[in-house]
Amino acid sequence: MEVVGDMRRYVALLRGINISGKNKIPMAELKKGFEKLAFEEVKTYLNSGNVIFSSGEDDTEKLTKQIQGMIKDQFDLDIPVFVISRETLEDILQNAPDWWGNDNKEIYDNLIFIMPPAKFSDVYSEIGEPKKELEKIEGYKDVIFWSFSRKDYQKTNWWSKTASANIGAKLTIRTANTVRKIVSM
């Protein structure tokens, strides 16, 4: 794990903010909220709730609760948050399947982060098998690599179901390019 003194780098992924005018959280204000929690080297990426920060805390569950509490206090929103160490995220990318994250413009590559306590088996049993000719999935740790045809995405099994009320609240999704950028920050 990248450690500076006793500090470790983490990524917080907020679910469902700044989408179609709902759950508005300005990134500059979010950054200040993280800094008030005594997190250091706070950076945000895009407007979709990607925050990179350093903390001396080892327990991602504690970090998650702190961040969710700050968001509730500062923005009066109940936002699911997924916290992961940068080291773990690097390991995930190093273990990506060969078919995921290449430069094929016909394919859309995503990484699905599964919010604890949900597990891959919960997600899979809720959504079902992918349509093999249109999409691929592979689970690893607390994520699912998911790729699908850009032109036929509406025909995939996972596209509409990842946003369903039952399972959608247990997931947050980022593109391959976004995840790579976050790791490099």
Regions from the PLM with identified roles:
Residues 1-6:
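Short, Lys/Arg-enriched N-terminal segments with co-localized hydrophobic residues
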